Amino acid sequence: MTDDAARFGDPRIPAETITSQSHLFHLSAVSPTLYDGGSLQQAHEDNFPILKGQEASIQLITLQPGGIREPHWHPSAWEINLVTSGVATWVLIDGNGNNESFEAHVEDVVFAPQGSFHYFENRGTEDLNVLIIQNTSAPEDKDNIGIGQSLSTIPPRVLSAVFGIPAETFASMKKINDAVVILRST
């Protein structure tokens, strides 16, 4: 049962998404989070209260041409991705070290297992839209470990040893404190 007082009085929930039906959410009414390279809209337990405790969330990612979904992994969630427009170029490395690269077209479904390292990008000339369903009720930034943030926490001397490049190269790299989520290739 939904607590209507909490649902309709919570300032974190945009009024445009609220309906008299507790099971209905207007994703199109959520202001997208904008990035250089695309945008993200999502429904999760913080803005769609019926999801609390259900271990479910949904995202709509739009990548502009040249946009990249930052290489990342989710420690506690798998995801199912449905391409609704455009072509996504995928790279996925699973927990067994299997590495796959492929293109996903409209109506193709891509599964990224929990803990797998993955990303997709838009190498095309039109926007790419991917609908993502995850088995977590948390917002994307609460169950997402991006490569930029991860590499920023490793000392330059260690990265130098791994890649065989002078430590100064890594010391001069921009430090990233949060997952970027979406970026643009240069």
Region locations from a protein language model:
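Glycine- and acidic-residue-biased ligand/ion/polar-headgroup-sensing regions
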Residues: P65, H74-G95
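Beta-strand cores of secreted/periplasmic/IMS beta-sandwich domains, seen most often
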Residues: L60-T62, T84, F120-E121
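A short, N-terminal "cap"/entry segment at the start of jelly-roll beta-barrel domains
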Residues: M1-L60, Q64, E70, S160-T186
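Short acidic-glycine-tyrosine-enriched beta hairpin
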Residues: L63, I80, D94-G115
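Ligand-binding loop in jelly-roll beta-barrel domains
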Residues: W78, T89, H105-V106, Q114-E140, ...
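Intrinsically disordered, low-complexity regions enriched in proline, serine, glycine
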Residues: P71-W73, L92-I93, E100-S101, N129, ...
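Short histidine-centered beta-strand/loop micro-motifs
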Residues: I50, E70-H74, S101-F102, E121-N122
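A contiguous, mid-protein "functional segment" used to position or interact
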Residues: E126-K174
